[in-house]
Amino acid sequence: MPTHRGLRHLALRVTDLARSRAFYERFLAMKVVWEPDPDNVYFSSGSDNLALHQIAPAELAQYQPLRGQLLDHVGVIMENPAQVDDLFRDVQQDGARYGATIAKPPKQHRDGSYSFYFADPDGNVIQALYEPTISR
């Protein structure tokens, strides 16, 4: 059986590309690496890649029933709990301007990890996570 070398990217359909672009630049510090046309933008953090694709208004109805049901969340790893708290404060203070909402406040988990959840303008949930065994 062929093996893969890892996940290349995550692609999300969005309803307002400009608003979503601002969200991912502001809160996840993603950098645009390619913008082939007005309906698509590709980001990288240096090691992780994200693609955003504008949903055409005529196609929106076919995606609405699925929204929030297929993707549970995307996790981003943070170096330490203080960074989780810093990002939480940033989203609390500046999130509304970028269409961000807090989904779950910071919490210490049983496995020693620490995280909070927030949603992008289209309701895609992101977990900002400190995980002791891999955050080092």
PLM regions with names:
Residues 109-110, 129-135:
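Short beta->alpha transition motifs characteristic of CBS
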Residues 14-18, 74-121:
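Vicinal oxygen chelate
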Residues 31-68, 125-130:
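Conserved short beta-strand elements that form part of the metal-binding/catalytic scaffold
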Residues 28:
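Major-groove DNA-recognition helix of helix-turn-helix-type DNA-binding domains
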Residues 3-6, 67-71, 109-110:
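Short glycine-enriched loop/turn motifs at secondary-structure junctions
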Residues 1-18, 74-76, 132-136:
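N-terminal beta-strand motif that seeds the catalytic metal site of vicinal oxygen chelate
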Residues 20-25, 123:
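Conserved active-site tyrosine of GNAT-family acetyltransferases
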